[in-house]
Amino acid sequence: MLDLKFVRTNPEVVKEALKKRNSNVSLDAFLEQEEERRKLLFEVESLKAKRNTVSEEVGRRKKHGEDAEQLILEMREVGQKVKNLEDKLGEIEQSMEAVLYEIPNIPHESVPVGADEEANVEVRTWGTPRSFDFEPLAHYEIGEKLDILDFARAGKVTGARFTFYKGLGAKLERALISFMLDRHSAKGYVEVLPPYMVHRNSMIGTGQLPKFEEDAFKVAGTDYFLIPTAEVPVTNMYREEILEAEQLPIHHCAYSACFRAEAGSAGRDTRGLIRQHQFNKVELVKFAFPENSYEELESLTRDAESILQELELPYRVMALSTGDLGFTSAKTYDLEVWLPSFNTYREISSCSNFEDFQARRANIRFRRAPKAKPEFLHTLNGSGLAIGRTVSAILENYQEADGRVRVPKALQPYLGVEYIG
């Protein structure tokens, strides 16, 4: 969330950021409450000063044997007024905090300004989409023909947007997880295997709640949520902590299953692995000094790109516009892999710098020196990569005319075969 003091002193900056994001959050009610809060605070402080003066007078009178009963009654009345005003002040501050939780992050100055994804800017491309001398199939058709993906039985067992991986399909998924974790660990990321359930405060800390609760799977009768991404537990590992400067930067990689309701995606990508309720992903999470966080974003993005390059999958990097930026992000690069069945690029990773937005919500701070005042650090994360979408890209880009799928060279040591099928 944003700094309350910043919002109070820079309302026009925040309003402009909300406008660029096409956000429907109104700051007017917040500012009206801020004005009322200031008035109440002044009144409370004035009454407290009066109470202190009366208290001193009561003490003086008692010391000299004078009657102080009327002053004592007056002091009690003042005390009750203070309590009532402080209760009202607490309600207003609670309401203001609720509004703060609804205000998205302020886009970095380098983010392209635009209404939606049409305003996203291509930063670079890598590789050349393959030309086929036959009609390429979609990944779900390939998976079903090779009997390595079973959508029908998963639908019978659970429902839509679930999949059984079978045989070499399951091994391909597992190989990709190991391959990605190995590559990221070799670059200094410390591997974490996180819990798949977190409580409400953790979801609030990374920004999924309260705004996106309809997209989350909640465990009935508990305060637990199934994680939508490893970002949530890994970021919250350091919630309510003050780190020392020598601990930074912290780089983690984490494999997890991810669970998403996809409430706003009815009718979109209903077939295949692109949009599932449950999917696997390797996540990259960073905790950085504020002054270095944009360098960290560039290196994180390159680390995610390196996986696609080793797998020899064509992709492009897109800088998201202000209108397409995620709620918590100050700047995001999307990596989009080429999928022949769509004849276009599709997102396979989002790499974001949240600056201190998540750190404020989760209260993650650091000290530059042993006795220095704690500061909020910057958090970053990115997919490195989404496994199901990587499987989709491999099946489609490496399919052969005879129905087999060639295994990328980088994965052959993990899978032990050159072809699937």
Curated annotation (Swiss-Prot):
Main location: cytoplasm
Alphabetized InterPro entries for the sequence: aa-tRNA-synt_IIb, aa-tRNA-synth_II, aa-tRNA-synth_II/BPL/LPL, Ser-tRNA-ligase_type_1, Ser-tRNA-synth_1_N, SerRS_1_N_sf, SerRS_core, tRNA-bd_arm
Matching PROSITE patterns: AA_TRNA_LIGASE_II (PS50862)
Sequence positions that bind ATP: R260, A261, E262, E347, I348, S349, S350
SUPFAM superfamilies: Class II aaRS and biotin synthetases (SSF55681), tRNA-binding arm (SSF46589)
Similarity-based family: Belongs to the class-II aminoacyl-tRNA synthetase family. Type-1 seryl-tRNA synthetase subfamily.
Protein name, entry field: Serine--tRNA ligase
Provenance organism: Desulfitobacterium hafniense (strain Y51)
Lineage summary: Bacteria, Bacillati, Bacillota, Clostridia, Eubacteriales
